[in-house]
């Protein structure tokens, strides 16, 4: 009965290695998905602008993401998170090859949490501005601009989707890394 694996003991056999390798592959897949989400959000927001003529072609109103510092923060934060995630991809591949690496996984968890905080702050700030763009604020006499700049608003609203998706994937990455460390 000693080798039966009862009473909370875990097996270090081939099945355990297969599960660890599976967790590492899932980590790599999640990182690629998070790169796509953050990079797409940064590009979509960073290339957003719309020009609207006012009475004549000589007088025009132009709306750009860079007109609002919050949206600039959104682009920078998602770019930083995307760069980090791209840099972390080789380390994630190393974990597939050497699934016993403990310290590098701890470093990844630390930076994953920092990137989660950064992306959460950026997505939340961006969502507040998008809400104001769609609805305005009557008490502050801020008018909704989305009725005039519809293309601009569609793009900034769409860029939030990738950022919030990346947030969810980063949470899953942190949980996955915690499970992988707990299995050691």
Swiss-Prot record:
Glycans are attached at residues 49, 137. It is a multi-pass membrane protein. The chain crosses the membrane at residues 23-43, 73-93, 106-126, 160-180. Its main location: membrane. The keyword Signal does not apply. Keywords: Cell membrane, Cell wall biogenesis/degradation, Glycoprotein, Membrane, Transmembrane, Transmembrane helix. Residues 1-22, 94-105, 181-184 are cytoplasmic. It comes from the Eukaryota. GO terms for biological process: cell wall organization. It is found in: Cell membrane. Residues 44-72, 127-159 are extracellular. Homodimer and heterodimers. Belongs to the Casparian strip membrane proteins (CASP) family. Regulates membrane-cell wall junctions and localized cell wall deposition. Required for establishment of the Casparian strip membrane domain (CSD) and the subsequent formation of Casparian strips, a cell wall modification of the root endodermis that determines an apoplastic barrier between the intraorganismal apoplasm and the extraorganismal apoplasm and prevents lateral diffusion. This is Casparian strip membrane protein 3. It comes from Brachypodium distachyon (Purple false brome).
